[in-house]
Amino acid sequence: MSEEKREVKIHGIYKHFKNKYYIVEDVAYHSETQEEYVVYRRLYGDNSLWIRDKKQFLSETNHVKYPDVQQKWRFELVDEV
């Protein structure tokens, strides 16, 4: 696992390792555990809103499960779609 420090960019556009694009709307907190969650929106299809825990959002792609994927991170910040 990388020691690289990554942060979520609000309103940043991210590419998922399965080649779909999302925009981060905000970071929210679980009311009981205070765990951080990333709130993000699909930039395709129904443009639905999703949440994922911040640690998982910023994690590396599982290259054992997805050996053909070249992207290092599950979600990578991009300049444009």
Label the predicted regions.
Residues 1-81:
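Mixed-charge, low-complexity intrinsically disordered regions
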